[in-house]
Amino acid sequence: MDKLRITGGARLHGEVVISGAKNSALPILCASLLTADPVRLSNVPQLNDTRTMLRLLGQMGVKAESAQTSVNLQADQVHSLEAPYELVKTMRASILVLGPLLARFGEARVSLPGGCTIGQRPVDQHIKGLEALGAQITMEHGFVVARAKRLKGASVRTDMVTVTGTENLLMAATLAEGQTILENAAREPEVIDLAELLIKMGARIQGHGTDRIVIDGVERLHGADHTVISDRIEAGTFLCAVGATGGDITLRNTDAAIMGATLDKLTEAGLHIESGPGWIRGVMNGRPKPVGIRTHEYPGFATDMQAQLMALNTIADGTAIVVENIFENRFMHVQELCRLGADIDIDGHTAVVRGVARLSGATVMATDLRASASLVIAGLAAEGDTLIDRIYHLDRGYDRMEIKLRNLGARIERVTGKEDE
């Protein structure tokens, strides 16, 4: 099993190209199921999750041709309407095939999802919404089994804001009969990106980017070309890294406009930020200031950035309060950060982070995707060597992270098998 070995203390300098957004690419790949025509995508990140999604689509009969960050898809010979457990268990985003399959083919069988073990993350809102559109849904042998002759437009209000739920219902509604109104919809940039692709495919959608999306169903969708937006979480992670190590880095292929809350908090921490079309520069000198955060749905502070900013707070000059409002059980990185010398107490959904003058390297274990990133940031700032185990979590959502960091001057390497012994 691969690990990362980091020798901390190196300041980061240089430029890094940010990859396409994982949380945009996954639903967009699934949207190819909505048409028999070719869908041509660019800026698709090279991640374990995108590779898993392409394997899943391939098992269904979708033809896919990949060349670096470009993917051409065509779902004109779909022969399976099932997403099996062996693929779904590693990636909860597999549930995103449910809406497109049901809308176009009238049937879908999707195993209950896996992915990061962060709380319950239920799919009940997906089911509730699809049932409102006329689907008959049962649970059979661990599968969500959905059937509908043709979905019919309806007003759907989810009990909570759910990004994947909004995306599933948005895709399903594009081919439904009549008008669908999604209330309490997610406003994330990745939802907007999906909607923009669907509009290129012939969907009639208004209000994406607000909490009320209106979809007028059409008979069929056609092919399209689309460029996936840049990954705001990867961008934020690299800015947290330079905040922890000090230095001067410039991010390319990124968009400051979709990173408001993250940039605000990093500025508060003492990172000097400049930005322009397609780039963000982060300069850090001295010790970071403590920054309190409360996670919220977009445009609030993203739960996917909570662990990384906590890593920055561990070496801040003071105490910070971190409140996790989105997912339960999303402080699994705290125990590992404490192994590096962090001073953190947890009380329910709140963590109290008392900054220390320095962290010291140790062997730690990644528990989920963003926790992995927080340990990388802490390891970069720590004195001595840090060895991070279970980095397959990191590979799910970061495109060649250690190579990008090494190009910025970090002392980081991937070790395989028994190299670390």
Curated annotation (Swiss-Prot):
Catalytic activity: phosphoenolpyruvate + UDP-N-acetyl-alpha-D-glucosamine = UDP-N-acetyl-3-O-(1-carboxyvinyl)-alpha-D-glucosamine + phosphate
GO annotation, cellular component aspect: cytoplasm
Annotated disulfide bonds: none
Pathway(s) the chain acts in: Cell wall biogenesis; peptidoglycan biosynthesis
E.C. code: 2.5.1.7
List of catalytic residues: C116 (proton donor)
Recorded GO MF terms: UDP-N-acetylglucosamine 1-carboxyvinyltransferase activity
Keywords noted in UniProt: Cell cycle, Cell division, Cell shape, Cell wall biogenesis/degradation, Cytoplasm, Peptidoglycan synthesis, Pyruvate, Transferase
InterPro entries recorded: Enolpyruvate_Tfrase_dom, Enolpyruvate_Tfrase_sf, MurA_subfamily, RNA3'P_cycl/enolpyr_Trfase_a/b, UDP_GlcNAc_COvinyl_MurA
Sites bearing 2-(S-cysteinyl)pyruvic acid O-phosphothioketal, chain numbering: C116
Pfam (any one): EPSP_synthase
Subcellular location: Cytoplasm
Any one biological process term the GO annotation gives: peptidoglycan biosynthetic process
Group of enzyme by EC: transferase
Keyword Cell division among record annotations: yes
Binding site for UDP-N-acetyl-alpha-D-glucosamine: R92, R121, P122, V123, D124, Q125, D304, I326
Chain residues that bind phosphoenolpyruvate: K22, N23
Entry's family note: Belongs to the EPSP synthase family. MurA subfamily.
Function recorded in the entry: Cell wall formation. Adds enolpyruvyl to UDP-N-acetylglucosamine.
Name of this protein: UDP-N-acetylglucosamine 1-carboxyvinyltransferase
Species of provenance: Bordetella avium (strain 197N)
Phylogenetic classification of the source organism: Bacteria, Pseudomonadati, Pseudomonadota, Betaproteobacteria, Burkholderiales
Gene coding for it: murA
